[in-house]
Curated annotation (Swiss-Prot):
One CC-aspect GO term: cytosol
Binding site for (S)-2,3,4,5-tetrahydrodipicolinate: H133, G142, T143
The protein, known as: 4-hydroxy-tetrahydrodipicolinate reductase
Purpose: Catalyzes the conversion of 4-hydroxy-tetrahydrodipicolinate (HTPA) to tetrahydrodipicolinate.
Organism encoding this protein: Mycolicibacterium paratuberculosis (strain ATCC BAA-968 / K-10) (Mycobacterium paratuberculosis)
Oxidoreductase as UniProt keyword: yes
Gene Ontology BP, a term: lysine biosynthetic process via diaminopimelate
A Pfam family this chain is assigned to: DapB_N
Pathway: Amino-acid biosynthesis; L-lysine biosynthesis via DAP pathway; (S)-tetrahydrodipicolinate from L-aspartate: step 4/4
Residues binding NAD(+): G7, A8, K9, G10, K11, V12, D33, G75, T76, T77, A102, P103, N104, F105
Recorded family membership: Belongs to the DapB family.
Amino acid sequence: MRVGVLGAKGKVGSTMVAAVQAAEDLTLSAEVDAGDPLSLLTDGGTEAVIDFTHPDVVMGNLEFLVRNGIHAVVGTTGFTAERLAQVREWLADSPGTSVLVAPNFAIGAVLSMHFAKQAARFFDSAEVIELHHPHKADAPSGTATRTAKLIAEARKGLPPNPDATSTSLPGARGADVDGIPVHAVRLAGLVAHQEILFGTEGETLSIRHDSLDRTSFVPGVLLAVRRIREHPGLTVGLEPLLDLG
């Protein structure tokens, strides 16, 4: 398969360029970065693209890719329900084209979200702490937002988190994502980390994942690239490719 990389000179993008070059069954067709024309992808006969760019440009990238029948594996964050609806609308006019958008491609991170969803209904309280390098554009992270939504979905019909806080500084209790507090830390020296905390009477449970290097995203991204054609339309999250349900 001929694979292009968008955001090829970024920290994650350059890691993906090296990964595609090292894969015997993949051919690097184009390296595209800020200021480069997207036509480099079509000129190179690109069949699938890995996009690790920026929330400000990713939608324009996807519109171009879908209209040209190029499959997309997207690790760029900032996808709202409205943005996903727009991608579905584009895909409706391009049957057979596939887009996979995932907040995290580290297998361990995907598993931690799955474990959190399973655990959520057994505990009274749940909170999420995500920790990233200070250059990250969005807060909270897409992974933390999705984790909180999965927990909230699993807890439907249960009482809300017990919390007697009546006075606090703005933001002290984190962002509210469907009733789940999410706290974002930005600190030099970090890459990508998340801890999910559960509590009930007499016990707590912590589920933590640490990406210590950006190479942690490679296995998940390459899995998505190799299987993207099996999932026409829009897929959100890596879970369907891991048969997690």
